[in-house]
Regions:
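Acidic, low-complexity central loop/insert segments
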Residues: 94-149
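Residue-level signal for inorganic ion chemistry
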Residues: 83, 104, 159, 209, ...
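The conserved catalytic core of RNA pseudouridine synthases
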Residues: 58-64, 82, 171-203, 207-218
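Accessory RNA 3′-end/elbow-binding domains used by RNA modification enzymes
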Residues: 2-46, 52-73, 77-80, 98, ...
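Short, charged/polar surface micro-motifs in flexible loops or helix N-caps
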Residues: 86-90, 111
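Extended alpha-helical targeting/anchoring segments
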Residues: 153, 157-176, 180-182
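Short, structured patches in soluble enzyme cores that scaffold and shape functional sites
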Residues: 106-108, 156, 167, 188, ...
Length: 335
């Protein structure tokens, strides 16, 4: 009897050990696949979900740890949210200051505590601006250079989103900051609402724009819908969250992730030779030939930034000073 019990114990231990080995091998396979996911997806974030909620959903679905987004959209807003996978997270800083494009609607005659439809009504009137007044006000709006973010915005205060603090009733102040409105156009006007398109610098808050425009027109207004339609020069072909999650497996994800360098302009690209790649990998600047430099488009917008690659092994973001290329971000793609 004792012998039988010992035999059963050994058999159980053997099964557990084999299961562990299978699990470990499966984990290694998953990790190898994870290491291959280095690139970008441009997500159409649904309204009602925070940017971080979406990120955590993707992490859990595909068992990915290294993941990030750029250009936070608060829960009310929907639209363009760039997601960086793996080593692409090292390039987030190069696009976070890109201009943004939005479509949004204002409902006239009502002021809410949050600047949108979720807040409590704090004031009302019956003034509905006419088309002529709106168009005249938009011309003035384009000249605004400083803006105080709305308390129900995604602006961070000591690491906490302003809208989270505001919902908890925390008293705080936000400082005015520089903005640049490149375009501000009326797209549609109905009885008590209007839809607008705006193209503006990073850090422009649409709720604040809507309230400023309403005040300029002698009325109240709140944002009833907000959709980001553009992000710098990035491709505007987006994938919905439902479509992304329906892929189920990381191998399917790998097939649709955009290349790591897709967030950079195509003008200033350089294919490296082996010896130059070795130097840049070690952080050593290299000198370029004049004929190579002639092919580059260098101006204030490019910031003399050069994207250099060696096969599919090395990706470098560098700054060109005269003939010398200084590596700023070096990404080893071999593992």
């Amino acid at each position: 009897m004792i012998s039988l019990i010992n035999h059963l114990k050994l058999t159980y231990c053997s099964i557990v050990l084999k299961s562990f080995k299978i699990y470990r091998n499966l984990s290694n396979i998953l990790n190898r696949n994870y290491n291959k996911v280095n690139g970008w997806l441009f997500l159409d974030k649904p309204s009602g979900k925070s940017s971080n909620y979406v990120l955590q959903k993707i992490k859990k679905q595909f068992n990915i740890n290294k993941l990030g987004f750029v250009g936070t959209l608060d829960p009310l807003a929907s639209g363009f949210l760039p997601i960086a996978f793996g080593k692409a997270t090292k390039t987030i800083r190069y696009i976070e200051k890109s201009y943004k494009e939005y479509l949004f609607s204002i409902n006239w005659g009502i002021k809410t505590s949050t600047g949108d439809y979720e807040g409590e009504i704090v004031n009302t009137n019956k003034t509905i601006p006419d088309l002529k007044s709106i168009r005249e006000a938009l011309i003035k709006m384009k000249n605004i250079k400083r803006q105080t973010p709305h308390k129900f915005s995604a602006k961070k205060i000591n690491g906490i989103r302003a809208y989270n603090l505001a919902r908890k009733g925390v008293n705080f102040e936000l400082s005015a900051q520089h903005i640049n409105i490149l375009e501000f156009d009326l797209k549609e006007s109905q009885n008590n609402s209007a839809t607008f398109y705006v193209k503006s610098s990073s850090g422009t808050y649409i709720r604040s724009l809507a309230e400023t425009l309403s005040e300029m027109l002698g009325t109240f207004g709140f944002v009833s819908s907000l959709h980001r339609v553009g992000f710098g020069n990035l491709d505007k072909k987006l994938i919905s969250l439902d479509s992304l999650l329906s892929l189920m497996h990381i191998d399917n994800l790998i097939n649709i992730v955009r290349p790591l360098g897709c967030v950079f302009e195509d003008n200033n690209r350089l294919e490296l030779k082996y010896d130059d790649a070795k130097k840049l990998f070690k952080g050593i600047p290299i000198n370029l030939h004049e004929k190579e430099i002639k092919n580059f488009f260098l101006d204030s917008s490019s910031k003399n930034r050069i994207i250099a690659k060696y096969k599919d092994d090395l990706f470098v973001v560098g700054i060109l000073d005269k003939i010398t290329l200084y590596p700023k971000t070096v990404i080893d793609l071999r593992n």
